[in-house]
Amino acid sequence: MKYLLLLNKTLLNITSFLAPNYCGKLAVDIFSKVRRKTIRDQEKPFYDQAKKFEVAREGENVSCYELGNPDGKLLFLVHGWESNPGCFVHFLPHLSKYRIIAFTLPSHAHNKETHTNMYECKDAFKLVLEHIKPTEQFHVVAHSLGSSVTTFALSETSCQVDKLVFLSANNKIEQVFQDFQTLLGFNDRVYRLLEKRIEKMVGDKLSEMTVEERLEKVKFNELLLIHDKYDKIIRYENSEVLHQKFKNSQLIPFEKIGHYRMLWNKKVLGEVLRF
């Protein structure tokens, strides 16, 4: 892993001077590549219980899963980066009264595609919403990147949401790219090329892409934020900013429950169910 990081760093730094256009493309390719992770044994029961269906999408269809009570209140589950819908399997026995809809983010889990980004994931969620056509308020439980995907998708719809639950939410998308620069250790020239290419792709300035700004456009009643104070993937401060911004939010801090492990924590589950 360290060797690969060093190789990518060296390659990006050199090409930033010799072939800047290629460097920008290469940086985006490295950033958007999804590491293919095997479905964990504890996640497999999710797929055994679910009814699978697909929503048409250019490239590769969106794999969707329905569980629970077909006549219950609608609840969407949105997983995070390099994860899969099975990460919510621990929640299923306690959500059986709901009509649960989950979907696999592009290029994740069983998908054949290998690269994606938050905007593609956002568009995938919008396609799922268009397919389901909610007629009443619904709930969303989202983890990690899923909170951004949820926010950006809903901000571009007229959907009425009852409760939002964000587990380890991020806020500034720009921070994700800055952390990527820190991880690989490439120079500022590479970062500027990466930033320029991303902004051209999505049509938005990176510095203006924030969950707090987009969430203002979402019609929702309540927001629950749960975050580990020592989360090593997404800083706790992200949830603090969102909580301070929205009066109809509640922030519950935890310690040492991890970023992914929190999805298997009984106390976290209890707080979600109480909400």
List the predicted regions and their residue ranges:
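Conserved alpha/beta-hydrolase "acid-adjacent" motif
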Residues: 232-238
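Catalytic histidine-centered segment of alpha/beta-hydrolase-like enzymes
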Residues: 257-267
